[in-house]
């Protein structure tokens, strides 16, 4: 549990984002919470970080003069995106991600899909088809007596970003399939989605 510098609420670390004083006394995001030095924790959310900048919560929490970039919320989002891209690349190397509508659908039908990733610039009909495949599969699982089954569906990255991470061109649909590297990518996708939503 850590205290949010903005709201002063104690929250689990998973619900917070850490910032540290970097070179030249500038506040920088520490997305993995591993950097040395005293950190400042803020609720995991783009709006919360922007509000913390506006209210000078970093200087108040550190009790010191620090420089805070006006675009700190955007910088934190970029860092979270980069961590997701790195995790997706590792999942690809581990063989724990499939791409293309046909392979993704096969992973869903084989009950191997841990999460679905759709490019933010995908056509509406393609998005809808993949989403309905997931919903249909989850509904069938519930009918079979498997309660609480919800396969996450993320639209966080563009097709160019997905392609770059996976070493492919024009990636519109991808599915994380079961494995440790895929679990890591899923955790990073959930973290980024939470940051964007809040």
Where are these regions (language model features)?
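Positively charged, polar, low-complexity stretches
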Residues: 101-102, 106, 128-155
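Conserved nucleotide-binding/hydrolysis micro-motifs of P-loop NTPases
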Residues: 11, 47-49, 121-124, 160-161, ...
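Short active-site oxyanion
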Residues: 38-39, 94-95, 113-115, 148-152, ...
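Extended interfacial segments that mediate partner engagement and assembly in macromolecular machines
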Residues: 47-124
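N-terminal cysteine/histidine-rich coordination modules
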Residues: 1-56, 60-64
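Helix-rich interaction surfaces within compact, conserved domain-sized segments
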Residues: 148, 153-198
